[in-house]
Amino acid sequence: MATSGRLLCLCLVLGLIFESLGHPVMGEKRAGENASPSARSLPKRLGNVEAPCGNQTCQFGCCEDDVCRELNCEHVDFPNY
Protein backbone atom coordinates (compact mmCIF):
# COMPACT_ATOMS: atom_id res chain seq x y z
CA MET A 1 0.00 0.00 0.00
CA ALA A 2 2.87 2.37 0.75
CA THR A 3 4.39 1.77 -2.69
CA SER A 4 1.17 2.69 -4.51
CA GLY A 5 0.84 5.84 -2.39
CA ARG A 6 4.37 6.89 -3.23
CA LEU A 7 3.76 6.21 -6.92
CA LEU A 8 0.60 8.32 -6.83
CA CYS A 9 2.45 11.20 -5.15
CA LEU A 10 5.26 10.93 -7.71
CA CYS A 11 2.77 11.12 -10.59
CA LEU A 12 1.06 14.14 -9.07
CA VAL A 13 4.37 15.93 -8.51
CA LEU A 14 5.53 15.18 -12.06
CA GLY A 15 2.21 16.44 -13.41
CA LEU A 16 2.60 19.71 -11.52
CA ILE A 17 6.18 20.11 -12.71
CA PHE A 18 5.30 19.57 -16.38
CA GLU A 19 2.30 21.89 -16.08
CA SER A 20 4.44 24.65 -14.62
CA LEU A 21 6.96 24.23 -17.46
CA GLY A 22 4.21 24.90 -19.99
CA HIS A 23 3.91 21.44 -21.49
CA PRO A 24 0.17 20.87 -21.91
CA VAL A 25 -1.08 17.38 -21.32
CA MET A 26 -3.87 17.72 -23.85
CA GLY A 27 -3.72 19.95 -26.91
CA GLU A 28 -5.96 22.98 -26.66
CA LYS A 29 -8.02 23.96 -29.68
CA ARG A 30 -7.99 27.50 -30.93
CA ALA A 31 -11.20 29.43 -31.55
CA GLY A 32 -11.21 29.06 -35.34
CA GLU A 33 -10.60 25.32 -35.44
CA ASN A 34 -14.21 24.42 -34.64
CA ALA A 35 -15.69 26.62 -37.37
CA SER A 36 -17.11 24.89 -40.41
CA PRO A 37 -15.21 25.27 -43.69
CA SER A 38 -18.08 27.25 -45.22
CA ALA A 39 -18.00 29.79 -42.37
CA ARG A 40 -14.25 30.30 -42.77
CA SER A 41 -14.52 30.94 -46.52
CA LEU A 42 -17.40 33.45 -46.25
CA PRO A 43 -15.22 36.61 -46.34
CA LYS A 44 -13.34 35.24 -49.34
CA ARG A 45 -16.58 34.56 -51.21
CA LEU A 46 -17.94 38.06 -50.55
CA GLY A 47 -14.83 39.73 -51.89
CA ASN A 48 -14.73 43.50 -51.97
CA VAL A 49 -18.14 45.11 -51.67
CA GLU A 50 -18.01 48.36 -53.60
CA ALA A 51 -20.82 50.79 -54.36
CA PRO A 52 -20.69 53.70 -56.81
CA CYS A 53 -20.85 57.06 -55.07
CA GLY A 54 -20.41 60.25 -57.08
CA ASN A 55 -16.96 60.18 -58.69
CA GLN A 56 -15.67 57.36 -56.49
CA THR A 57 -16.64 53.93 -55.19
CA CYS A 58 -17.33 53.19 -51.55
CA GLN A 59 -15.88 50.00 -50.13
CA PHE A 60 -17.72 48.52 -47.11
CA GLY A 61 -19.71 51.69 -46.55
CA CYS A 62 -22.66 53.63 -47.89
CA CYS A 63 -23.13 56.72 -50.01
CA GLU A 64 -24.79 59.85 -48.61
CA ASP A 65 -24.78 63.10 -50.61
CA ASP A 66 -22.03 61.73 -52.91
CA VAL A 67 -19.73 61.08 -49.91
CA CYS A 68 -18.72 57.65 -48.66
CA ARG A 69 -19.76 57.05 -45.06
CA GLU A 70 -18.18 54.26 -43.04
CA LEU A 71 -20.13 54.80 -39.82
CA ASN A 72 -23.80 55.39 -39.03
CA CYS A 73 -25.06 53.70 -42.20
CA GLU A 74 -28.59 52.43 -41.90
CA HIS A 75 -28.14 49.73 -44.54
CA VAL A 76 -25.47 48.37 -46.82
CA ASP A 77 -26.44 47.18 -50.29
CA PHE A 78 -24.62 43.99 -51.21
CA PRO A 79 -24.32 43.11 -54.90
CA ASN A 80 -26.36 40.18 -56.17
CA TYR A 81 -24.36 37.04 -56.84
Swiss-Prot record:
Entry's family note: Belongs to the teretoxin M (TM) superfamily.
Modification after translation: Contains 3 disulfide bonds.
Secretion signal, residue range per the UniProt entry: 1-21
Domain notes: The cysteine framework is VI/VII (C-C-CC-C-C).
Protein name per its UniProtKB record: Teretoxin Tsu6.8
UniProt subcellular location: Secreted
Keywords: Cleavage on pair of basic residues, Disulfide bond, Secreted, Signal, Toxin
Keyword Disulfide bond: yes
GO CC list: extracellular region
